[in-house]
């Protein structure tokens, strides 16, 4: 299985990333260094409210939720957006429509440099528009805090939001994400996200208990590497659903019997519909209560009920069965009256009021609280989670007085009863722990929980998984604060699929294959250059570069300097094509003349045309001048060509050298080196020394830089191994192998394929490394000497030895000497 080696060079073309040329051996498996997954909580870290988390991996950035803090207002309620560059975010996923998860989305989309795409489920988008419109109405006009955004900003952001169906997978720039049912509220979703092979599960707010209209949260089929999980209730435990409902209806029934009023602060959407279903069914079963009115006070009451009536098919079997069998819509309540405000509310006698907002910070629920607080017959039932810093959290402690919303200095006496009965549809410890077991993720990041609850949950989980420590299933748990970064290292292993002509040929182990790796998002393809247009849509071209420099040096000097740098330079003679062509033309012309002359001689019946000696001499002079002219012109066309590293050609003429190469990073580097050498040939001291003559005549000298023959290299290889291992290196009698024996350890080198066998493995590995290094040492830089060449060299040496023993070599040498003497005599 091959790994990448060497230096990676890449450049981007459109959506594709071309990763140079690489050599791969065996299977095409890409491995790279550790990649870091980053998680930052801009909100919702060790707190409940303004949920906003950012994950980054492999150059992709995803934001999860964009809410506000219900205990604050204005800019103070926003997540810490200033701590992150929002322009780098590719995708923003909204889990559900609650204000602490979605209310700052218009601010992000319209007031910042955010450029990504936003996704949420269809019901969430349907409710988002009306819920945030009410949020703008309630929060606008405050003198102390500027408005976060306007109605126009909300409308503009709404038009940019895209929707996703449950169980459908979408892909954006290589990031895949899928929505699953999360329970909690209508349209709530948990998301599985896959980025560069790393799988993440973000639960958002979720419930593992089926209620009257929603299914419980699903367990995604994939096993995530990272779980981002809510910790709202920490280690707390909920009452069973039926017991909670009985206690709720019992409290309401007893309050009405004693002539009091019941106030149930809720969010306008979500848990309010669940409570209304419970109350409507209870009133149907108890005719004695039907004289008391149930009010649902919300400016969005009718609009929101219409949304719930629209998305019945996304609810549980109970609601769909009632809709199918009874032919009625369960959300068309029989005993519940909708009111937008308190202007026409007849505050006389016992009643039940379900009013928003749920945190009692302002609005109808806060007004009624201050109005009903002094009467001990009244009851306040908190059905949702109370966030730290809100009136709902404060009144749980049952203070004697509460401040007025309009004038905090004005105190209102509290005499009404306060009961907390959670219908918040969040998981308790048992449900959360079971879900974490089913998901079975090694890395768990806790969010959306107050500090104490989150720390208790972390401690409980660590105690539960203590037995998995130092095992493959060991779990790591994080509970970061806001703006604290969590980094997790993942080693990515990616497979490059061969396509095109390269995929048609089945490679064998050990084969070297050259191609281009093309990356699109997180997918890799290995193909030949010729297949780029067909499979990727990219056109290719080769740039032939040429440069001519003045070089006043002969062929020998140029060859000498190139060999000093590159070790081996292939030399090719450039034939004088011009002279040969002209001589051929002259020969053909003369042949035509002879044929023509023969024809004339036949037709003239033996007549012979006399030519004077002067005319013959004149023609000979013209031919001689023509020949000299041709030979003079041949100096510019004849020359020598050198090939350096099989990539750069150097055409040498008496006055210049022309360098040609196909443009690439490697070829450009070689060409630069060749050019630098040619520019220094003239003034090099070595050139002066070599070109000077110690005698008046010119003759050849021994070339000290000539390339060694194959036989010499084979002997050099054996000498290197002998020097490395000393007396332990012994060549076998047949010369086909060599043994290296050190104490009880022994390794054998086979000269047939230059393989090493023996034991123990460390010795075999060391000997193999020595053989490989020796092979690379006996050949020049530019000439690759394969094991096959060396094996042939060994065979040639053995053949010569055998022939010497048989006397064949001596006879051949004598015949060769006689042949040379005969040639000299003939000369």
Swiss-Prot record:
Transmembrane segments: none
Family annotation (SMART domains): Beta-Casp, CPSF73-100_C, Lactamase_B
EC numbers on record: 3.1.27.-
Residues that, per the record, bind Zn(2+) 2: 100-101, 205, 448
Region (Disordered): 583-621, 802-827
GO-annotated biological processes: mRNA processing
Gene3D superfamilies named among the record's database cross-references: 3.40.50.10890, Ribonuclease Z/Hydroxyacylglutathione hydrolase-like
Presence of the UniProt keyword Hydrolase in the record: yes
GO cellular component: mRNA cleavage and polyadenylation specificity factor complex
Cross-referenced CDD domains: CPSF3-like_MBL-fold (cd16292)
Amino-acid positions noted as binding Zn(2+) 1 in the UniProt annotation, renumbered to this chain: 96, 98, 184, 205
Compositional bias ranges of the Acidic residues kind: 583-592
Annotated Basic and acidic residues bias: 606-621
Active-site residues (renumbered): 426 (proton donor)
Subcellular location: Nucleus
A GO term for molecular function: 5'-3' RNA exonuclease activity
Chain's role: Component of the cleavage factor I (CF I) involved in pre-mRNA 3'-end processing.
Protein name per its UniProtKB record: Endoribonuclease YSH1
Organism: Yarrowia lipolytica (strain CLIB 122 / E 150)
């Amino acid at each position: 299985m091959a790994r990448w080696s060497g230096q990676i060079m890449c450049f981007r073309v459109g959506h594709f990333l071309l990763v140079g040329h690489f050599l791969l051996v065996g299977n095409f498996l890409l491995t790279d260094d550790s990649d870091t997954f980053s998680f930052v909580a801009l909100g919702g870290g060790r707190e409940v409210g303004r949920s906003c988390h950012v994950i980054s991996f492999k150059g992709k950035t995803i934001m999860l939720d964009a809410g506000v803090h219900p205990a604050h207002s204005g800019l103070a309620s926003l997540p810490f957006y200033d701590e992150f560059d929002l322009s780098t975010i590719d995708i923003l996923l909204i889990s559900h429509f609650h204000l602490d998860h979605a209310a700052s989305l218009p601010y992000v989309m319209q007031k910042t440099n955010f450029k990504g795409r936003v996704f949420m489920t269809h019901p969430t988008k349907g409710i988002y528009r009306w819920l945030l419109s009410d949020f703008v109405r309630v929060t606008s006009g405050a003198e102390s805090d500027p408005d976060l955004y306007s109605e126009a900003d909300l409308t503009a952001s709404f038009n940019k939001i895209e929707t996703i169906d449950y169980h459908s997978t979408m892909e954006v720039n290589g990031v895949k994400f899928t929505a699953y049912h999360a329970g909690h509220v209508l349209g709530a979703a948990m998301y599985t996200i896959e980025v560069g092979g790393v799988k993440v599960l973000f639960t958002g707010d979720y419930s593992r208990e089926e209620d009257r209209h929603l299914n419980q949260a699903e367990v995604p089929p994939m096993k995530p590497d990272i779980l981002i999980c809510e910790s709202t209730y920490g280690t707390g435990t909920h009452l069973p659903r039926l017991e909670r409902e009985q206690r709720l209806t019992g409290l309401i029934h007893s309050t009405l019997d004693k002539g009091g009023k019941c106030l149930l602060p809720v969010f306008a959407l979500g848990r309010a519909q669940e409570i209304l279903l419970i109350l409507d069914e209870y009133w149907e079963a108890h005719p004695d209560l039907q004289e008391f009115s149930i009010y649902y006070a919300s400016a969005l009451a009718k609009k929101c009920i219409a949304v719930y009536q629209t998305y019945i098919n996304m609810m549980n079997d109970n609601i769909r069965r009632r809709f199918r069998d009874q032919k009625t819509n369960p959300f068309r309540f029989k005993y519940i009256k909708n009111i937008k405000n308190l202007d026409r509310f007849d505050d006389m006698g016992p009643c039940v009021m379900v009013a928003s907002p749920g945190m009692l910070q302002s609005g109808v629920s806060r007004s009624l609280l201050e109005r009903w607080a002094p009467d001990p017959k009244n009851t306040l039932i908190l059905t949702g989670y109370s966030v730290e810093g809100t009136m709902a959290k404060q009144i749980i402690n049952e203070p004697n007085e509460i401040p007025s919303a309009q004038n905090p200095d004005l105190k209102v006496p509290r005499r009404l009863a306060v009961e907390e009965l959670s219908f918040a549809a969040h998981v308790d410890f048992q449900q959360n722990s079971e879900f974490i077991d089913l998901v079975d993720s090694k890395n768990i990041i806790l969010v959306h929980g107050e500090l104490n609850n989150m720390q208790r949950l972390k401690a409980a989980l660590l105690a539960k998984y203590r037995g998995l420590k130092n095992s493959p299933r060991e779990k790591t748990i994080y509970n970061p604060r806001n703006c604290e970064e969590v980094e997790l290292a993942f080693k990515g292993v990616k497979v490059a699929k061969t396509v095109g002509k390269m995929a048609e040929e089945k490679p064998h182990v050990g084969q070297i294959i050259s191609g281009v790796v093309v990356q699109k998002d997180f997918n890799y393809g290995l193909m030949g250059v010729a297949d780029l247009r067909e499979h990727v849509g990219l056109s290719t071209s080769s740039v032939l570069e040429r440069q001519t420099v003045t070089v006043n040096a002969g062929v020998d000097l140029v060859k000498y300097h190139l060999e000093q740098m590159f070790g081996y330079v292939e030399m090719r003679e450039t034939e004088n094509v011009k002279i040969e062509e002209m001589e051929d033309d002259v020969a053909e012309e003369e042949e035509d003349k002879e044929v023509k002359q023969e024809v004339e001689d036949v037709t003239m019946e033996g007549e012979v045309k006399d030519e004077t000696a002067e005319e013959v001499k004149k023609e000979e002079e013209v031919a001689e001048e023509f020949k000299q002219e041709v030979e003079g012109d041949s100096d510019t066309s004849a020359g020598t060509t050198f090939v350096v590293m099989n990539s750069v050609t150097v055409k040498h003429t008496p006055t210049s050298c022309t360098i040609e190469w196909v443009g690439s990073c490697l070829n450009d580097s070689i060409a630069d080196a060749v050019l630098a050498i040619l520019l220094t040939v003239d003034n090099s001291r070595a050139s002066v020394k070599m070109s000077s003559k110690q005698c008046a005549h010119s003759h050849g000298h021994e070339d000290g830089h000539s390339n060694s023959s194959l036989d010499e290299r084979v002997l050099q290889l054996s000498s290197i191994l002998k020097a490395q291992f000393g007396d332990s290196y012994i060549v076998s009698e047949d010369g086909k192998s060599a043994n290296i024996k050190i104490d009880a350890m022994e390794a054998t080198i086979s000269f047939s394929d230059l393989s090493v066998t023996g034991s123990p493995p460390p010795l075999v590995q060391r000997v193999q490394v020595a053989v490989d290094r020796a092979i690379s040492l006996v050949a020049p830089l530019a000439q690759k000497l394969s094991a096959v060449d060396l094996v042939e060299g060994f065979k040639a040496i053995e053949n010569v030895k055998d022939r010497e023993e048989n006397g064949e070599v001596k006879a051949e040498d004598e015949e060769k000497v006689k042949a040379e003497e005969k040639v000299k005599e003939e000369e």
